[in-house]
Amino acid sequence: MEKIRDTRWDVLKGLLILCVLYRHFLVYGSSISYIASKTVANFVHVFTMPLFVFVSGYFTKHVDETKRYWFGILGVFETYAVYQIFKGLLYHYSIWQLISFPALMMWYLLALVIWKIVYFCLNKMKIKVNGILITLLVLIALAVGFVPFIGETFALSRIFYFAPYFFLGIMLQNIKVIDEIKLRLKVPLAWLILIVALICSIMASVYNGFYIVDGVFQGNEPYPEEEKWIYMGLRFFSYLVSFIVSISVVRLFVNTNRTLEIVGKDSLKFYIFHGFGLMAFGILPIPWKYGLAGLRHNSFANHILLQQDQAF
């Protein structure tokens, strides 16, 4: 018998997707020049993608259902491929760009495909997802920063950086994570953690550290040549900060909320299509002379999405 879904997970996804959308409006809009906007963008970035990746791992289907498992992987890849190809046509991507550089927001779908395939292989090799594996993944993520060619190409750096969160979600599938957090973490401590994180975000914004924080918590580039060890330390620190802030967010804000629950159930669609919202507000350029192609792109991708299980 399939276990009853805890709707608080949908509330969490709804909260996260709204944070992601708001952050993208800040980052890609002109308001990012203001201290307040930078502060919010930095603060939100600390927990949104780590929690999204964790939730994706937490709800990853069991490999024992091989046909259904691969159908889910192909569904995610199909959605990724449709967007990548059509956006490539709209913006005149070269073949190399089309293959090697995921379009804005699409890197996550490519990462999901890779992580799910890796999990399938680990399962077939009888390798358990446990604390040792998570530690190894963190060490690998720290190490790849020293490799100059592992960066935004194929989103490899991000795939390595966020992998520990995905497999941590898989490892904790049999634990009622939300209940455990609410039981063990006291509300005053959770508020203190978030206040300290917010103060640090303000300081980073005031002292022009926005892009340093942004880069560290995205993990999308190799370490700067002259400061490799410093940035490795920052990357390790980012894992600790994201973990602590994330559980605090869950403790304080993940409760019953019908509106967020509704949004959370369609989080993948919001994630993929909010690019059109950015275009509508003039934050991202609209290829007007390819408008009809854009409409076909939107309709076809939506048709694909409606046929697939949600990846989030």
Show where each model-derived region lies.
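Alpha-helical transmembrane segments and their immediate juxtamembrane cytosolic regions
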Residues: 1-312
